[in-house]
Amino acid sequence: MNQEEMIRDVRKRLFEMQDTGYRDFHARLIPTVEKEKIIGIRTPILRKFAKEFGKTERSEMFLKVLPHQYYEENNLHGLLIEQIRDYDKCLGELERFLPHIDNWATCDLLALHMMKKHRDIFSREIYRWMESDKSYIIRFGISMLMRHYLDEGFKPEYPEKVAAIRSEEYYVNMMRAWYFATALAKQYEKILPFLEEQRMDIWTHNKTIQKSIESYRITQEQKDHLRTLRIKK
């Protein structure tokens, strides 16, 4: 089977999983993607397919195909990268794939749990991504800090790096707020000074407080204090 035949076959399989109602709903959540490029596949179903497809030789061929035509093809690509257990190979495939991400959902789909075993060296790549000129690469870098470096891997320099980012991009700043809201739930005393000393732009500062107040992981006492830290525009 050549590459063109493989893509046709994969695409046929993807359309067999289509849910048009879900497509119409999901299209409203990812306005940066044209609706015509969304097939409409629920994530658990796509994950199951990716797990099966990842065991075949065709998956290696699929990873060589970039850019993709459909949103779900990009998501499938990301889910296949997640299955790679070799650090260098995984990083290499990420480098090829990240510039093609064009929406927050594909960006946030990638968890890369295997990177927990490589925290000491993976942080260097995260720093580099956060200095990118591409919004979704920056967002991805922040998401990796949030997923893998807020518990035993936490260092004070990490929130400093996120706070220092200056961007006009909504999807970058929303991830920054999400990072700090999650960090407050896990490292409250170490993160609180970023709000008390107003180390971020006003929008991200206030959005962090909003998301924290909405969180069940923040105590009522903490929420009451956070409310006093809102910046009035």
Give each language-model segment a name.
Residues M1-K233:
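Alpha-helical scaffold domains
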